[in-house]
Amino acid sequence: MHTLYCYVDGSDNQTVEPVLVDAFRALVSDWAQYRAVLVNHQHERTPDMAPDDLSDWFIGLNLPLPHVSRSLIDQLVLFTKALAGVTARDFVVGISSPSGGSEDLVFLNANADASEGSRLYTKLEATLHGA
């Protein structure tokens, strides 16, 4: 099953982790009927990383695609816009496939507007239907 993801874009999240996690936890709770899942996963450091390199850190949510609607997309855009304003972070929304592949569809920030929801929904539909 394909999954929609929405994660903070970047790995320098130490100072804003509590705000991000609390906000996404609340949204996941509101979207429990859609089987939304909170994600807060920081990858282990690897030997090839320089001392000042940050390991990948995914903070956000996953949502099974059968449950994604235009209304949820619009809510997600408003949510990320507000959270970007509070945290000064951008967000990436994309789709992952059961085979493990993923495709980033849009990047959202504090300036996101209703057109971003339309663009995201159009890209989502095109990706799912092979257009």
What residue ranges belong to the model's regions?
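Generic alpha-helix signal with a bias toward terminal, lower-confidence helices
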Residues: P18-L20, N40, V92
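Short, extreme N-terminal segment that most often corresponds to the first beta-strand
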Residues: M1-A32
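A common structural junction motif
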Residues: F24-R35, K81-A88
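Short, glycine- and small/hydrophobic-rich beta-strand elements in well-ordered beta-sheets
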Residues: D30-T46
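Charged interaction segments
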Residues: H43-A131
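Short N-terminal secondary-structure initiator segments
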Residues: M1-C6, H41-E44, G94
